[in-house]
Amino acid sequence: MTVPATSTRKDLMIVNMGPHHPSMHGVLRLIVTLDGEDVIDCEPILGYLHRGMEKIAENRTIIQYLPYVTRWDYLATMFTEAITVNAPEQLGNIQVPKRASYIRVIMLELSRIASHLLWLGPFMADIGAQTPFFYIFRERELLYDLFEAATGMRMMHNYFRIGGVAADLPHGWVDKCLDFCDYFLTGVAEYQKLITRNPIFLERVEGVGIIGGEEAINWGLSGPMLRASGIRWDLRKVDHYECYDEFDWEVQWQKEGDSLARYLVRISEMTESIKIIQQALEGIPGGPYENLEVRRFDRARDAEWNDFDYRFISKKPSPTFELSKQELYARVEAPKGELGIFLIGDNSVFPWRWKIRPPGFINLQILPQLVKRMKLADIMTILGSIDIIMGEVDR
């Protein structure tokens, strides 16, 4: 009896990764086609966290809509609030006091650090390094203490308002934040010592998921995904929004375009954010923290507002104003990339159209191309380096 020669196995295996799996970043489902350990194809399936955020906006005033926007990217809620108030501010040409602008910059950069920290921990856990996952919560708790002292909430802050912020910084907060900045720089140095030159870490990320500069532009990538491919593009420098021009800081970038480059960009961005925060805290001016002119009601004061129902059951409407009949695109540099809003007003208090441009949704589109011809284990490395939050992707 002759034994047949061993032939190369040609049958492919289809594996579903997610949507309910601890290794996935939210409720993302990947349909992966494998030939052994090699990835032949990958199809992301979205929509498991879709909540109709754009349609909800068309039936709410801006103030009523603010609590919803913190549920997009729930790890960097200051940015979703910022873009939600920036769009009507630009549409109505509403001026923001200098102190309010400084407070906004401080909160935005603290939120950027918090987002990058909670990217770093799970990313390292994805590739097998468990220790940094516990380290990042040490600094993150201090950040949330600062947020809680200033806004009353550890997450979902609901702090930004049209024309300023909801409340001034409490007494002693500036000194507490400066102490955190000094402490955090030692924490970043510890991360770099622990991770950056680790040979096992380098083996997992170096040369994995390479994106060229022209390719990144063609795919519409933004944020660290774009800057890690050699493109020095940061909306804080390009659009000159808030008061970023008044601070001395540099755009962080790398030219390699791989997962290691994206890691290095985010680590460096945390250090640059600390520089911006320190300058803002030391130079924060006095004055009002909101523009009182925008807090007006559309209709005259009603005598019924002093009755029991209105005083104790809170039936007073939110202060708001009409959105003029024009269109506008506003954007900010969020931790994950360009977060934009396309707003169309029609002389009512509700937006006629509220189109969200989420960075995670755009950045995720390149995933199938990056993982093809890679190993199965590299999928989590590449997906982690993209940094997505499904609340923002699905909206």
Swiss-Prot record:
E.C. number(s) listed in UniProt: 7.1.1.-
UniProt KW keywords: Chloroplast, Membrane, NAD, NADP, Plastid, Plastoquinone, Quinone, Thylakoid, Translocase, Transport
Lipid bilayer topology: Peripheral membrane protein
GO cellular component: chloroplast thylakoid membrane
Protein task: NDH shuttles electrons from NAD(P)H:plastoquinone, via FMN and iron-sulfur (Fe-S) centers, to quinones in the photosynthetic chain and possibly in a chloroplast respiratory chain. The immediate electron acceptor for the enzyme in this species is believed to be plastoquinone. Couples the redox reaction to proton translocation, and thus conserves the redox energy in a proton gradient.
SUBUNIT field: NDH is composed of at least 16 different subunits, 5 of which are encoded in the nucleus.
Entry protein name: NAD(P)H-quinone oxidoreductase subunit H, chloroplastic
Originating species: Chloranthus spicatus
